[in-house]
């Protein structure tokens, strides 16, 4: 195969709607350009610096064909490795290189992987409201659109605060009460099952808001409502407690969106402590490690449900879909409808049809960035208060 030299790399941040989205663009001497997602929306400038100041000079002049070698070099070149900034930066380049290779092969990405194992991937979306009436309205809307899986949240992560008794002059932050959250969420499950029966599968994201003993109690209480899965019931630092949950509840568990390092998921998969791996593809370094992780999970009966939130470019979401139609153990894909500005910046962003997402048949990933449109939505940064989650006594808790 003829050498295809990398001639330029650019990192672009744009904020068409709520989130700062990061795209890496790799140009080659063949004239083929690739696009990849590097979104770490809480630290976008750090990722851009990593790409512009470190990866770009490292990669200019290298052969874009050698994706595996370039990935390994990017990961170890700084000596320190497997952190969210470097992984997202590497991911942007890695996805772009796969995009280039698929375009040169004149194949959609999933065909380059080895073809499809399914026609389409089932999707779930988010229904969130501070009241049950508002939640019912959203569920009804999504059922009409053909969704069979809906993530239901009463209020933001941690629930709807109700007369929280804080300390005097409380420290600034986003307060919630864990006992209120458990009680209200269990009641939410009960109400949804009473109203809808088994018309759809309920998913729920705890978002690591509980202590381990509370997580055990919560899992036991919601088990009777047969959730499709409970997500992030514990933070990554407390995964040893998953055995305790497994011993007391059969509720399906999904975990992984915060993982960066293979050591964070290997034992969970080998010991079958989770039913679904929820890794964020750019957070683990892109397509190259995601394919390896998917096949590793298959050996142990663990299914794939990649993290796919709104703070991800449609390029990254399209990569998830290509992975999902290829990997036999893919279970479901998260999806939140794109707003008009995002669709303008990322033409061809896919939307579900009757509860399913279909992989693009265009050569490559199938979604690119309109660089001119992206300039209309410059990056904005402010400290996030929702990640300053606090318990009533004022102590910080994992967000």
Swiss-Prot record:
UniProt-annotated binding residues for Mg(2+): 205, 231, 257
An example Gene Ontology biological process: amino acid catabolic process
Residue numbers binding D-arabinonate: 207, 257, 278, 307, 334
Transmembrane helix is among the record's keywords: no
Pfam family, one: MR_MLE_C
SUPFAM superfamilies, alphabetized: Enolase C-terminal domain-like, Enolase N-terminal domain-like
GO molecular function terms noted in the UniProt entry: magnesium ion binding
Key words, A-Z: Magnesium, Metal-binding
Sequence similarity: Belongs to the mandelate racemase/muconate lactonizing enzyme family. GalD subfamily.
Function: Has no detectable activity with D-mannonate and with a panel of 70 other acid sugars (in vitro), in spite of the conservation of the residues that are expected to be important for catalytic activity and cofactor binding. May have evolved a divergent function.
Protein name: D-galactonate dehydratase family member A1Q3065
């Amino acid at each position: 195969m003829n050498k295809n030299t990398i001639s330029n790399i650019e990192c672009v941040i744009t904020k068409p709607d709520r989130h700062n989205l990061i795209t890496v663009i790799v140009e080659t001497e063949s004239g083929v350009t690739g696009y990849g997602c590097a979104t770490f929306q809480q630290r976008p400038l750090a990722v851009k610096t990593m790409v512009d100041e470190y990866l770009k000079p490292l990669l200019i002049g290298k052969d874009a064909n050698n994706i595996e070698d370039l990935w390994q070099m990017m990961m170890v070149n700084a000596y320190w490795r497997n952190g969210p900034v470097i992984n997202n930066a590497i991911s942007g380049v890695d996805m772009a290189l796969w995009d280039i290779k698929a375009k040169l092969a004149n194949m959609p990405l999933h065909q380059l992987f080895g073809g499809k194992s399914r026609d389409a991937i089932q999707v779930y979306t988010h229904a969130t409201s501070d009241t049950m009436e508002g939640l019912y309205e959203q569920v009804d809307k999504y059922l009409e659109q053909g969704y069979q899986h809906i993530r239901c949240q009463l209020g933001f992560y941690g629930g709807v605060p109700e007369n929280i008794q804080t300390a005097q002059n409380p420290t600034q932050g986003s307060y919630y009460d864990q006992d209120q959250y458990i009680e209200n969420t269990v009641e939410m499950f009960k109400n949804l099952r009473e109203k809808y029966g088994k018309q759809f599968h309920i998913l729920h994201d705890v978002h690591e808001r509980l202590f381990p003993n509370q997580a055990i109690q919560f899992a036991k209480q919601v088990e009777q409502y047969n959730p499709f899965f409970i997500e992030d019931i514990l933070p990554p630092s407390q995964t040893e407690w998953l055995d305790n949950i497994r011993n007391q509840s059969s509720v399906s568990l999904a975990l992984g969106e915060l993982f960066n390092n293979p050591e964070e998921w290997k034992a969970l998969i080998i010991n079958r402590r989770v039913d679904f791996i929820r890794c964020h593809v750019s957070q683990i370094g892109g397509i190259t490690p995601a394919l390896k992780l998917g096949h590793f999970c298959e050996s142990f009966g663990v299914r794939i449900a990649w993290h796919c939130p709104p703070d991800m470019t449609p390029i990254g979401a399209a990569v998830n879909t290509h992975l999902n139609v290829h990997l036999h153990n893919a279970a479901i894909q998260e999806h939140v409808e794109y707003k008009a500005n995002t669709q303008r910046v990322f033409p061809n962003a896919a939307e579900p049809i009757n509860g399913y997402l279909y992989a693009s048949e265009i050569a490559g990933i199938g979604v690119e960035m309109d660089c001119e449109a992206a300039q209309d939505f410059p990056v904005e940064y402010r400290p996030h208060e929702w990640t300053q989650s606090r318990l009533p006594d004022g102590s910080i808790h994992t967000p």
